[in-house]
């Protein structure tokens, strides 16, 4: 069989009737999906897709205020073959950093080996600021550089996740957080957490470890 789907500047407002009354969605999506298959030869089809969204905006009401999320860029790509599957994505929120990544699954019907990378660049809590009242603040920078390996049954992750210069003073948290640092390091099937959360009453020192020999240990 063969299937081809092409989107030419699809206006996402057509989905508005299916959303809750407090939700709003706008923007345009374009892209293409192609697939062909022969189940007598292989149960895994051949497929390719690429979708781009421009000016994607979503908002909902939270505690009486409107929380908007606007993406300057959103791109999703993928390829599926009997021998491998590849996913890719780029997400760029308005007014802050972005997220890029890719993931490959080799031998998806057998060993399902993984390899990939996710990079988060200079993300700030800009999305929280519409929820803040006058005098409240939320600052900090979130970054990550992670690589994946192993298999779906025994995943492995390497790299670092950091939160730097975190300051939070808002009604939805029980204390005021002064400049604080948190770091998470992944080393295959284990990770370490370090950091210091500073408050007016004192500091909270973070020090922890975790491991996951198999995927079942994630649950």
Identify the residue ranges that each predicted region occupies.
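Interface amphipathic segments
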Residues: 1-219
